[in-house]
Regions:
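A short glycine-rich, Lys/Arg-flanked "PGG" loop and its adjoining helix->strand segment in the class I
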Residues: 139-151
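Conserved Class I S-adenosyl-L-methionine-dependent methyltransferase catalytic core
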Residues: 1-50
Length: 279
């Protein structure tokens, strides 16, 4: 299981380089000197604004990670949230966190594949999960989104992508870090979205945000080098540092970006302008 391969490393490792909410995805830097925690909280707020969630709506978070987005949605809006993951470590953590925050009646976490769901949702969000879907399954993924999304609903897909034409993933990343992972070109996403019957209502390209995020992660790893080596070994530390430094370079000097796709079924699901996102 490709997701579990990466995310079921000991949680103690992630605590050594991620922000306190364990957000393992690109932050949103309003200023390049923002702290990692500030940027990650900015990201959550930005996504919640784009989803434009109303009270009592049903929200699905596909690939919910350690639950930060699902829990923050529940804390800020009186709605019903479902978070799903394929990682047992993440699932256990999410359930425990929901209990600690007394949000069990509002947030449900499930250890399940999104393809097994047969419910309707008003809002569907996926952060950093699309990279694991695989090119040959893009059509199936977006068709499933279309089937689960209410006619007046809004979906937001946040994914790493490339500004270059389609190409095979880097073999080192595939072998050592993300087996089965792939970062798509824009052209590879739009076609299956259209075929699924969805409308691209908004696209935002986050350019240097991930390079700033990765810089913070790399610096945190270096700061905690002794603990990481004790947890694993010197070889693992060098591999992890190389992974973070290489990805930082790809986002700063290469062709990697983050795309945020807002998808709907009709033109009236979102406001006429983007002002609501920044109010």
């Amino acid at each position: 299981m490709n997701v579990a391969h990466h995310y079921d490393l000991t949680d103690d490792l992630y605590d050594l380089f991620l922000d306190p909410k364990r957000q393992y995805s690109c932050g949103y830097f309003k200023n390049k000197n923002d702290s990692l925690e500030t940027a990650q909280n900015n990201k959550i707020k930005h996504i919640i604004k784009k989803l434009n969630i109303k009270p009592n709506q049903k929200v699905l978070d596909i690939g919910c990670g350690w639950g930060s987005l699902a829990l923050d949605i529940a804390k800020s809006i009186n709605c019903e949230v479902t978070g799903i993951t394929l990682s047992e470590n993440q699932f256990d953590y999410c359930v425990k966190k929901a209990k600690e925050l007394n949000l069990e009646n509002q947030v449900t976490f499930k250890l399940i594949d999104y393809r097994e769901l047969n419910e309707k949702f008003d809002r569907i969000v996926s952060i950093g999960m699309f990279e694991h879907v695989g090119r040959k399954f893009y059509q199936n993924f977006f068709k499933k989104i279309e089937q689960m999304l209410d006619y007046e609903g809004i979906s937001l897909i946040h994914t790493i992508g490339s500004v270059s034409p389609p190409r095979d993933p880097h073999p080192w990343i595939t072998r050592y870090i993300f087996p089965g992972g792939y970062t798509p070109s824009l052209s590879e996403v739009i076609k299956p979205v259209e075929k699924a019957g969805l409308i691209v209502s908004d696209i935002e390209v986050l350019k240097l945000h991930y390079s700033h995020t990765l810089r913070h992660w790399k610096e945190n790893c270096i700061k905690n080098k002794v603990e990481i080596i004790e947890m694993f070994d010197e070889k693992f530390f060098r591999m992890w540092e190389f992974y973070l430094a290489g990805c930082e370079t790809a986002f700063k000097w290469g062709d990697q970006v983050v795309y945020q796709f807002q998808l709907t079924k009709n033109y009236t699901s979102t406001p006429a302008t983007r002002d609501y996102i920044y109010q």
